[in-house]
Regions:
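Glyoxalase I/VOC metalloenzyme domain signal
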Residues: 1-7, 18, 25-165, 171-175, ...
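Conserved NAD(P)H cofactor-binding loop of Rossmann-fold oxidoreductase domains
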Residues: 11
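Membrane-anchoring hydrophobic segments
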Residues: 14-15
Length: 202
Protein backbone atom coordinates (compact mmCIF):
# COMPACT_ATOMS: atom_id res chain seq x y z
CA UNK A 1 0.00 0.00 0.00
CA UNK A 2 1.55 3.27 -1.12
CA UNK A 3 0.00 5.42 1.62
CA UNK A 4 0.18 2.89 4.43
CA UNK A 5 -3.60 2.42 4.42
CA UNK A 6 -6.25 1.18 2.03
CA UNK A 7 -8.97 3.18 0.25
CA UNK A 8 -12.01 4.24 2.25
CA UNK A 9 -14.10 4.43 -0.88
CA UNK A 10 -14.32 2.12 -3.88
CA UNK A 11 -17.02 2.79 -6.42
CA UNK A 12 -17.90 3.33 -10.06
CA UNK A 13 -19.25 5.97 -12.43
CA UNK A 14 -21.64 4.09 -14.75
CA UNK A 15 -22.38 7.13 -16.92
CA UNK A 16 -18.65 7.80 -17.43
CA UNK A 17 -17.39 4.23 -17.83
CA UNK A 18 -14.89 4.39 -14.96
CA UNK A 19 -14.35 3.10 -11.44
CA UNK A 20 -12.31 4.61 -8.64
CA UNK A 21 -10.67 4.19 -5.25
CA UNK A 22 -10.28 7.16 -2.91
CA UNK A 23 -7.60 7.72 -0.28
CA UNK A 24 -8.38 10.67 2.04
CA UNK A 25 -5.47 12.75 3.31
CA UNK A 26 -5.52 15.75 5.65
CA UNK A 27 -5.61 18.38 2.89
CA UNK A 28 -7.10 16.54 -0.11
CA UNK A 29 -7.94 13.10 -1.39
CA UNK A 30 -6.01 10.99 -3.85
CA UNK A 31 -8.08 9.21 -6.48
CA UNK A 32 -7.11 6.14 -8.46
CA UNK A 33 -9.23 5.88 -11.59
CA UNK A 34 -9.57 3.02 -14.06
CA UNK A 35 -11.67 2.05 -17.05
CA UNK A 36 -14.71 -0.03 -16.14
CA UNK A 37 -16.91 0.14 -19.25
CA UNK A 38 -17.55 2.28 -22.31
CA UNK A 39 -18.03 5.97 -21.59
CA UNK A 40 -16.69 9.46 -22.26
CA UNK A 41 -14.25 9.51 -19.35
CA UNK A 42 -13.15 5.92 -20.05
CA UNK A 43 -12.08 7.00 -23.52
CA UNK A 44 -10.05 9.88 -22.07
CA UNK A 45 -8.40 7.58 -19.51
CA UNK A 46 -7.47 5.08 -22.23
CA UNK A 47 -5.94 7.85 -24.34
CA UNK A 48 -3.88 9.00 -21.35
CA UNK A 49 -2.65 5.46 -20.62
CA UNK A 50 -1.64 4.90 -24.24
CA UNK A 51 0.33 8.14 -24.30
CA UNK A 52 1.73 8.36 -20.76
CA UNK A 53 1.26 5.01 -19.06
CA UNK A 54 0.13 4.90 -15.43
CA UNK A 55 0.82 8.41 -14.17
CA UNK A 56 -0.82 11.54 -12.77
CA UNK A 57 -4.00 11.96 -14.81
CA UNK A 58 -5.39 15.34 -13.84
CA UNK A 59 -6.50 17.87 -11.24
CA UNK A 60 -9.86 18.19 -9.48
CA UNK A 61 -10.36 21.64 -7.97
CA UNK A 62 -13.13 22.00 -5.38
CA UNK A 63 -15.45 24.99 -5.29
CA UNK A 64 -18.16 26.04 -2.83
CA UNK A 65 -20.28 27.59 -5.58
CA UNK A 66 -20.28 25.73 -8.91
CA UNK A 67 -22.87 28.09 -10.40
CA UNK A 68 -20.68 31.13 -9.76
CA UNK A 69 -17.64 29.26 -11.07
CA UNK A 70 -19.56 28.44 -14.26
CA UNK A 71 -20.61 32.07 -14.70
CA UNK A 72 -17.14 33.52 -14.16
CA UNK A 73 -15.21 30.94 -16.19
CA UNK A 74 -17.72 30.94 -19.03
CA UNK A 75 -17.15 34.69 -19.30
CA UNK A 76 -13.36 34.32 -19.06
CA UNK A 77 -13.21 31.59 -21.70
CA UNK A 78 -15.96 33.15 -23.83
CA UNK A 79 -17.88 29.87 -23.96
CA UNK A 80 -20.83 28.23 -22.21
CA UNK A 81 -19.44 25.66 -19.78
CA UNK A 82 -21.75 22.84 -18.72
CA UNK A 83 -22.48 21.62 -15.19
CA UNK A 84 -23.01 17.87 -14.80
CA UNK A 85 -24.54 16.04 -11.84
CA UNK A 86 -22.65 13.03 -10.49
CA UNK A 87 -23.34 10.20 -8.08
CA UNK A 88 -21.12 7.53 -6.59
CA UNK A 89 -21.91 4.46 -4.50
CA UNK A 90 -19.30 3.04 -2.15
CA UNK A 91 -18.91 -0.69 -2.81
CA UNK A 92 -17.49 -1.06 0.70
CA UNK A 93 -20.39 0.46 2.69
CA UNK A 94 -23.13 1.24 0.10
CA UNK A 95 -22.95 4.92 1.09
CA UNK A 96 -23.69 7.50 -1.59
CA UNK A 97 -21.96 10.74 -2.51
CA UNK A 98 -23.39 13.35 -4.86
CA UNK A 99 -21.64 16.20 -6.62
CA UNK A 100 -21.82 18.71 -9.45
CA UNK A 101 -18.86 19.28 -11.71
CA UNK A 102 -17.53 21.12 -14.74
CA UNK A 103 -15.05 19.51 -17.10
CA UNK A 104 -12.74 22.24 -18.39
CA UNK A 105 -12.09 21.75 -22.13
CA UNK A 106 -8.41 21.03 -22.75
CA UNK A 107 -8.07 24.00 -25.09
CA UNK A 108 -8.70 26.17 -22.02
CA UNK A 109 -6.91 24.00 -19.42
CA UNK A 110 -3.81 24.00 -21.65
CA UNK A 111 -3.65 20.22 -22.01
CA UNK A 112 -4.17 19.17 -18.39
CA UNK A 113 -7.34 17.22 -17.57
CA UNK A 114 -9.08 19.55 -15.10
CA UNK A 115 -12.46 19.54 -13.47
CA UNK A 116 -14.16 21.78 -10.94
CA UNK A 117 -16.30 19.95 -8.40
CA UNK A 118 -18.78 20.85 -5.67
CA UNK A 119 -19.76 18.02 -3.36
CA UNK A 120 -23.44 18.32 -2.44
CA UNK A 121 -24.33 15.22 -0.40
CA UNK A 122 -22.50 12.51 1.49
CA UNK A 123 -19.04 12.35 3.01
CA UNK A 124 -15.82 10.57 2.23
CA UNK A 125 -15.05 8.19 5.13
CA UNK A 126 -11.83 8.92 6.99
CA UNK A 127 -9.26 6.28 7.74
CA UNK A 128 -7.83 5.35 11.12
CA UNK A 129 -4.10 5.98 11.34
CA UNK A 130 -2.55 2.86 12.83
CA UNK A 131 1.06 3.61 11.92
CA UNK A 132 2.87 6.94 12.31
CA UNK A 133 4.75 6.23 9.07
CA UNK A 134 1.51 6.38 7.07
CA UNK A 135 1.19 9.24 4.58
CA UNK A 136 -1.03 11.97 6.06
CA UNK A 137 -0.96 14.81 3.53
CA UNK A 138 0.06 15.70 -0.02
CA UNK A 139 2.66 18.46 -0.15
CA UNK A 140 2.66 19.46 -3.82
CA UNK A 141 2.00 18.52 -7.42
CA UNK A 142 4.26 19.70 -10.25
CA UNK A 143 3.36 21.18 -13.65
CA UNK A 144 5.77 21.73 -16.54
CA UNK A 145 4.88 24.66 -18.79
CA UNK A 146 6.26 26.31 -21.93
CA UNK A 147 4.25 29.48 -21.25
CA UNK A 148 4.54 30.63 -17.61
CA UNK A 149 2.71 33.93 -18.22
CA UNK A 150 -0.30 32.08 -19.59
CA UNK A 151 -0.15 29.63 -16.69
CA UNK A 152 -0.31 32.49 -14.18
CA UNK A 153 -3.29 33.95 -16.03
CA UNK A 154 -5.13 30.62 -15.86
CA UNK A 155 -4.44 29.55 -12.28
CA UNK A 156 -4.30 32.95 -10.57
CA UNK A 157 -6.66 35.13 -12.58
CA UNK A 158 -9.20 32.60 -13.85
CA UNK A 159 -9.18 29.83 -11.21
CA UNK A 160 -8.51 32.31 -8.38
CA UNK A 161 -5.69 30.34 -6.75
CA UNK A 162 -3.20 32.42 -4.76
CA UNK A 163 0.21 32.89 -6.38
CA UNK A 164 2.61 32.57 -3.44
CA UNK A 165 5.92 32.55 -5.33
CA UNK A 166 7.10 33.74 -8.73
CA UNK A 167 10.86 33.41 -9.01
CA UNK A 168 13.27 33.28 -11.95
CA UNK A 169 15.90 30.55 -11.59
CA UNK A 170 18.99 31.37 -13.64
CA UNK A 171 20.44 27.86 -13.32
CA UNK A 172 17.85 26.38 -15.66
CA UNK A 173 16.60 29.57 -17.28
CA UNK A 174 12.98 29.53 -16.21
CA UNK A 175 10.45 30.52 -13.58
CA UNK A 176 9.40 28.64 -10.49
CA UNK A 177 5.77 29.32 -9.56
CA UNK A 178 3.97 28.24 -6.38
CA UNK A 179 0.18 28.40 -6.27
CA UNK A 180 -1.26 27.69 -2.81
CA UNK A 181 -4.71 26.31 -1.98
CA UNK A 182 -5.96 24.34 1.03
CA UNK A 183 -2.43 23.89 2.42
CA UNK A 184 -1.34 22.35 -0.89
CA UNK A 185 1.15 23.70 -3.43
CA UNK A 186 0.70 23.53 -7.18
CA UNK A 187 4.29 24.02 -8.28
CA UNK A 188 5.01 25.02 -11.86
CA UNK A 189 8.29 24.97 -13.72
CA UNK A 190 7.93 27.47 -16.55
CA UNK A 191 10.48 27.69 -19.36
CA UNK A 192 9.36 29.87 -22.25
CA UNK A 193 9.49 28.02 -25.58
CA UNK A 194 8.08 28.55 -29.04
CA UNK A 195 4.92 26.74 -30.03
CA UNK A 196 1.39 26.47 -28.73
CA UNK A 197 0.98 26.91 -24.94
CA UNK A 198 1.01 23.50 -23.29
CA UNK A 199 1.26 22.28 -19.71
CA UNK A 200 1.81 18.78 -18.39
CA UNK A 201 1.70 17.12 -14.99
CA UNK A 202 5.00 15.69 -13.87
Amino acid sequence: LVFGFGPTWQGSHPSLGTKNALFPLDNLYFELIAVNDDGPLAETVNEHLEKNGESVFGLALETDDIEMAKKELSASFNTDLEISDGKGVNNISNEERHWRNIFIPRKFSRGIFTLLIQHTKGNLPKHEISDESSISRMDHVVINSNDPDGLVDLYKEKYGIRLALDQFVEKWGGRMLFFRTNHTTIEAIGIKKDGSPEDSLW
